Amino acid sequence: MENLQKMISEKSVVIFSKNSCCMSHTIKTLFLDFGVNPTIYELDEINIGREIEQALAQLGCSPTVPVVFIGGQLVGGANQVMSLHLNRSLVPMLKRAGALWL
């Protein structure tokens, strides 16, 4: 859990993902299309990927990827991110976190 806390506090937008997950790809593309430069951790490529997945599960994230943190706060998975986007709450959240300026 300590590694997870350090990872999410380093940048304004952090995405935990897996290369094999199509929803992870969709969420990463959404943020990149906004012009946001998220820190992306591919859990199937890093040594502590399983440990991070377990920590995400302990936070209640199911499925464990994709998971998005904005401003150090858990936003959730693809469903939560898309809901925020559709109700026009995502961009203001990104601006408040300093991840988006326009």
Swiss-Prot record:
InterPro entries linked: GlrX-like_pln_2, Glutaredoxin, Glutaredoxin_subgr, Thioredoxin-like_sf
Database matches in SUPFAM superfamilies: Thioredoxin-like (SSF52833)
Renumbered ranges of motif Responsive for interaction with TGA factors: 99-102
Location of the Glutaredoxin domain: 1-101
Any one of the GO CC terms: cytosol
Reported function: May only reduce GSH-thiol disulfides, but not protein disulfides.
Record's protein name: Monothiol glutaredoxin-S5
Encoding gene (name): GRXS5
